[in-house]
Curated annotation (Swiss-Prot):
Its EC number is 2.7.8.13. InterPro entries: Glycosyl_transferase_4, PNAcMuramoyl-5peptid_Trfase, PNAcMuramoyl-5peptid_Trfase_CS. Pfam families: Glycos_transf_4, MraY_sig1. This is Phospho-N-acetylmuramoyl-pentapeptide-transferase.
Amino acid sequence: MFYWLIELTNTFPSLSVFRGVLNVFRYITFRTGGAVVTGALFVFLFGPWIIDHLRLRQGKGQPIRTDGPQSHIISKKGTPTMGGLMILSGLVVSTVLWANPLNPYVWIVLAVTLGFGFVGFYDDYLKVTKQSHSGFAGRARLLIEAAIALVACYALVRLGRDPSSTGLAIPFFKDLVIKFGWMYVIFGAFVIVGAGNAVNLTDGLDGLAIVPVMIASASFGLIAYLAGNAVFSDYLQIHYVAGTGELAVLCGAVLGAGLGFLWFNAPPASIFMGDTGSLALGGMLGSIAVAVKHEIVLAVIGGLFVLEAVSVIVQVASFKLTGKRIFRMAPIHHHFEQLGWTEPQIVIRFWIISVMLALVGLSTLKLR
């Protein structure tokens, strides 16, 4: 919306005196900064009201796993969930205000984010109303997520309009691209669905998921800005995708809304993100990675999410095949709890890992 302010000076000559000041709204970097501040302020201001409303409507709050760490039954009992509504509200408001409303990439990523958020919201709703961990049926949920992701990937491929839009770039190599053709739509959907569920599995401790999400968002905000700039992408020899620079504004909105949410999610949490937030944010990261052609880099920067997801897959596969469990409990953050690590130790150490992985992922932009 603010992007159009500069157009007012062209439409109304009497406003041309403000052209110098309003010209800053042309710059993605300025609008990204504005999106960060707006997203954070929105959640800061409306967060307490949303939390009170959710606590009143949910009563007992999110059901706590009885087979998990016993400390959670006491410390987390009665805490409301669906905190992702705070993040999504701040994200949408900030993006609408600061992003170019004519950019199709922004709307595609927003559609995936809200679509996954709706699936997560329904899952949270079922869990809260039934006071059970069996929410939305797993297969049905995955089918809906896959449908959303397939439509989004098809739209992204159509926007690309060149052979490289259906290829997979390999980090550290200048011209190595695996060509999928139209099968890339399926691969891209797998990336989006996988990212959504990986972040969902990570969200198990206060503050554990939101900070790595913010780190990944900041990293992909930079990648989107560079990939959407012809000069920078040519210098770094990365795939140029015209128009994706605007996704940096959306990433800024996520960063700001995430900061606001962390204020209330810091231990002891006043609210949980829930599937509403974790699925939405994971789907967002996956769709941005597909849009800017850095799918493998997402697996590096979001390596913590991959670790959490793999720990669950390995645990389930091992138990079904051998009857034995590899970890004391999965996802892996609960394994460390069982080993005696405190919740703050796990959360902060995982944050540190996320920062290190982000630096490694960003280094792939130059090391080719």
